[in-house]
């Protein structure tokens, strides 16, 4: 699993990523201006900036991003752009549903076998979901069930229009994917700049 072990808050300010709800917006505005005023942005630097922003937000490697781009070119994907494909990964979906506080935590929970997709155990964070998929918690994840039942993760849920509400069924939680075409995008990634960066 790809992890960044450096100073994360400094990286978030540098790339202007509003990822964690508990970070103050005022703190971001005051500090991001310090970086933006010193940089003279060229077109290539803008492309590099967007690529680094994407990599850090979703904890992706260069190899995985290139794999998705080749996949798009091979199958002529017109319905999705690169951001849409990354957004329907299982780890990002778990984070958006509110089962975890960060994407890194979502990856760890998936690898440890806490989630079923269509009632099959999936331990691959990069698993791509599709419309109609059903996500359920495994019986051993009772503490996550208790937290979600008490709505302690409600403030972390960003895109209630994409995913249906979480159903409580006995001792498990069920989430159904209804739509994956209009992905909520909080950080406004520029898909064109990212694609041009990898076209060199």
From Swiss-Prot:
The annotated subunit structure for this chain is: Part of the 30S ribosomal subunit.
Q: Where in the cell is it found?
A: Plastid, Apicoplast
Upper lineage is: Eukaryota, Sar, Alveolata, Apicomplexa, Conoidasida
Concerning its family, UniProt says: Belongs to the universal ribosomal protein uS4 family.
Query: Could you tell me the keywords of this UniProt record?
Result: Apicoplast, Plastid, Ribonucleoprotein, Ribosomal protein, RNA-binding, rRNA-binding
- Gene Ontology CC, one term: small ribosomal subunit
Its function, per the record, reads: One of the primary rRNA binding proteins, it binds directly to 16S rRNA where it nucleates assembly of the body of the 30S subunit.
Family annotation (PANTHER family): 30S 40S RIBOSOMAL PROTEIN, SMALL RIBOSOMAL SUBUNIT PROTEIN US4M
**What Pfam families does this protein map onto?**
Ribosomal_S4, S4
Q: What is its main location?
A: plastid
Which part of the chain is the S4 RNA-binding domain? 88-148
Name of the protein in question = Small ribosomal subunit protein uS4c
GO MF, one term, reads: structural constituent of ribosome
Biological processes annotated in GO = ribosomal small subunit biogenesis
Q: Which organism is it from?
A: Eimeria tenella (Coccidian parasite)
């Amino acid at each position: 699993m790809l992890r960044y072990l450096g100073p994360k808050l400094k990286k978030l300010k540098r790339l202007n990523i509003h990822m964690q709800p508990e970070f103050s917006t005022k703190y971001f505005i005051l500090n991001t201006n310090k970086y933006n005023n010193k940089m003279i942005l060229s077109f290539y630097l803008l492309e590099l900036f967007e690529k680094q922003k994407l990599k850090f937000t979703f904890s992706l490697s260069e190899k995985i991003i290139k794999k998705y781009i080749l996949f798009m070119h091979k199958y002529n994907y017109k319905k999705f752009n690169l951001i849409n494909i990354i957004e329907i990964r299982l780890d990002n979906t778990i984070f958006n549903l509110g089962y975890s506080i960060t994407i890194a935590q979502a990856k760890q929970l998936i690898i440890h076998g806490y989630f079923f997709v269509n009632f099959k155990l999936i331990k691959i964070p990069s698993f791509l979901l599709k419309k109609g998929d059903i996500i359920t918690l495994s019986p051993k994840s009772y503490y996550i069930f208790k937290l979600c039942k008490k709505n302690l993760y409600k403030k972390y849920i960003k895109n209630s229009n994409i995913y249906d509400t979480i159903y409580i069924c006995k001792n498990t939680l069920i989430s159904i994917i209804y739509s994956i075409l209009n992905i909520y995008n909080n950080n406004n990634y520029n898909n064109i700049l990212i694609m041009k960066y990898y076209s060199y």
